[in-house]
Amino acid sequence: MKTDKIKRVGLIGNTQKPESAGMIRKAARLVERAGRKAFVDGDAASLAREADLLLVFGGDGTMLKAARDIEGSKTPLLGINIGGLGFLTAVSSKDLPKALEQVWKGNFSYETRALIEVSGRCSGRQIRQSALNDIVVSRGALSRLISLDVSVNGEHITRYRCDGLIVSSPTGSTAYSLAAGGAVVLPTAEVFALTPICPHALSNRSIILPLNSTIRIQAMNPARATILSVDGEVVAELDANDEVTVRRSTNIVRLVHLADSSFLETLRRKLQWRGAYF
């Protein structure tokens, strides 16, 4: 990998984490020491226009926001974890100097991640939003089941009675979908995971669908609030008979994949897979 193209590095972080500012200052010094230019002022979108690489300090939530903010940009992201589990923030904060050395030496590749998109009319308002992890239609604060009518490519699947429904991207399979019983898929796989949340029918299981599918979800709840969330952020309420459509976005996000990192090794470590020994 040629590194002469990485001359300008943007640094952004989660301002809610006190350690973020200190880590950004440290990273800026390391970047400048390596003969590169560090940019620390501005939001993700403006920094992406200036930089050849964005370093993102925080947890997966910070990475998800950065990915949405720079949608349509080709500037790659490298996540530095100062949060919790951190599947997207692949580099531990203590390993930052080592990770940057790998970048300067060209020991990395770019990994393309698919974005997914939801569109439709919700409570009289037209919406269109992109997500890196997942799009969720779920019940509001009231602890009652909702009914969601779902079809794929025009073919009816079923009417779910559940707490909600997760449409996960390949990247998001290790997030909410996994917690709801969905399968883990490789982040480069060309699939959706359609996972019901606490379905009333035990036969309702997570379904893996091709990423070129068009998924339609219609709220069938005349007197109950139904919420649309994108990467964990509420974006709209659905009235009765409102419907949204989920499909692959035309945009992608590029992540930096360090040479010594592996998704399967990350699974073993983050999920504490021990295996069985007899």
Q: Where would I find each of the regions flagged by the language model?
A:
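ATP/NTP phosphate-donor binding region
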Residues: M1-L53, F57, K65, K94-S109, ...
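A residue-level signal for conserved active-site and pocket-lining positions in enzyme catalytic cores
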Residues: N14, L55, G59, N81, ...
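A generic structural signal for short beta-strands and their flanking turns/coil linkers
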Residues: A51, T112-I116, A131-N133, R144-L148, ...
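Short glycine/serine/threonine-rich phosphate/pyrophosphate-binding segments
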Residues: G61-A67, T174-A179
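Gly/Ser/Thr-rich active-site loops/lids in small-molecule metabolic enzymes
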Residues: R159-S203
